[in-house]
Amino acid sequence: MFFSFHFHSNLRSVVVMKFQKVYSVFFQVHHLLDLYDEEITKDAYGKTIRAKTMGQRIYINAMKRNDLVFGIGPAGTGKTFLAVVYAAKQLRKGSVKRIVLTRPAVEAGESLGFLPGDLKEKVDPYLRPLYDGLNTVLGREQTQRLIERGVIEIAPLAYMRGRTLDDAFVILDEAQNTTHAQMKMFLTRLGFGSKMVVTGDQTQIDLPKGVKSGLKEAVKKLSGVSGISIMKMDQSDVVRHPLVSKIINRYEGVE
């Protein structure tokens, strides 16, 4: 009698535990599906912009919850575009007063000194991905007006030195090409009421041989710090042509 009671009691406990696990999984799946349906913002034509992968959704949530976010991943994951989209949304809402866009002037051996024209003309080719996001959300004409008024500021990373960026949404793109000193300088510009997003691809470093990437070092040093989120995306988050994922896999030695 006691054995039978004990057996049924244990069986009931096992059934309850399994039910709880199934319910937990169901709840998580349901929650993830809801996240896909959640609107990030609308573009300049009123069309809804949503996350296209789970990695992108987690990335957006990280920007909502943290003042400093690292978005790391290969080409095509939307890490830069989504950062700009979210920055534009915060500007629209009045959560920030301006957007500051920057990136290091290191691209496959080139430097700004060898490019023609004034500062804007020199910087523009390096910031094209950032412009694309702004034009999508705000429209080309409004983006240009905001740049002219200084609400959107676009500058090389070197121009960040000595500044404190309050009430701003600051994006550092191509951060894998920063040095240790540049990354430290940039991160310490964070002011009150501001958010920073640092994007980069650790497999696409164009720094001179022997120079360590400031992005790699920052990820190691700042992992686990409260208020900082390090979001790593992979080929499953690539939303470009299907061949892009295959190319990334081959170059990274993944079959």
Predicted features along the sequence, with ranges:
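Conserved adenine-nucleotide phosphate-binding loops and their immediately adjacent elements
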Residues: 36-48
